């Protein structure tokens, strides 16, 4: 813990810094997001529509054979690194995957306000490969301010 006045949440072996407004309702919402599963499962066309309406945040979605798949487990482990700031979604349904143009064990990365996703190359992936890709592509972009992350800041890249 290196910042005075910061709030840190310990979850398992992870330390998560809270970068939001110090208001009771915001803190409770943040903590509730942390206790949810790191990956939200999409099983229906209605859930696909809800997924598509999330346009102002980074999100990832993958298509996997089952929850027991080693590739899904790697995806789930990677999601824990970014929870609750980046939303991870998965489907095991072929119809949903077809609607989203996903292939088996493929993960799509959506930037805020972008229509088309970036397909993470070289599938299937390990947890480390997914984490590395997200960190590399996670960048300051136009996005809606939310109380739970309104004070998040990025380091300037002085080397261009």
UniProtKB/Swiss-Prot annotation:
Q: What is its main location?
A: other
Pfam families, sorted: Calsequestrin (PF01216)
Could you tell me the keywords of this UniProt record? Calcium, Metal-binding, Muscle protein, Phosphoprotein, Sarcoplasmic reticulum
Enumerate the subcellular locations listed in this protein's record, separating them with semicolons: Sarcoplasmic reticulum lumen
GO cellular component terms, semicolon-separated: cytoplasm; sarcoplasmic reticulum lumen; Z disc
Q: How is it modified after translation?
A: Phosphorylation in the C-terminus, probably by CK2, moderately increases calcium buffering capacity. N-glycosylated.
Job description of the protein: Calsequestrin is a high-capacity, moderate affinity, calcium-binding protein and thus acts as an internal calcium store in muscle. Calcium ions are bound by clusters of acidic residues at the protein surface, especially at the interface between subunits. Can bind around 60 Ca(2+) ions. Regulates the release of lumenal Ca(2+) via the calcium release channel RYR2; this plays an important role in triggering muscle contraction. Plays a role in excitation-contraction coupling in the heart and in regulating the rate of heart beats.
Q: How does it assemble?
A: Monomer, homodimer and homooligomer. Mostly monomeric in the absence of calcium. Forms higher oligomers in a calcium-dependent manner. Dimers associate to form tetramers, that then form linear homomer chains. Interacts with ASPH and TRDN.
User: What's the protein name?
Assistant: Calsequestrin-2
Q: Which organism is it from?
A: Sus scrofa (Pig)
Q: State the organism's lineage.
A: Eukaryota, Metazoa, Chordata, Craniata, Vertebrata
Name of encoding gene: CASQ2
């Amino acid at each position: 813990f290196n910042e005075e006045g910061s709030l840190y949440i310990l979850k398992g072996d992870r330390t998560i810094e809270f970068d939001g407004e110090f208001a009771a309702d915001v803190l409770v919402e943040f903590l509730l997001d942390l206790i949810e599963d790191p990956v939200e499962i999409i099983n229906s066309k209605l859930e696909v529509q809800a997924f598509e309406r999330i346009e102002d945040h980074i999100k990832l979605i993958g298509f996997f054979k089952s929850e027991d798949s080693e590739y899904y487990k790697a995806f789930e482990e990677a999601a824990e690194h970014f929870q609750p700031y980046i939303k991870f979604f998965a489907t095991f349904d072929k119809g949903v995957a077809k609607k989203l143009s996903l292939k088996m064990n493929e993960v799509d990365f959506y930037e805020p306000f972008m229509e088309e996703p970036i397909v993470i190359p070289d599938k299937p992936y390990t947890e480390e490969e997914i984490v590395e890709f997200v960190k590399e592509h996670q960048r300051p972009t136009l996005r809606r301010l939310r109380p739970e992350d309104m004070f998040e800041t990025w380091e300037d890249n002085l080397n261009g």
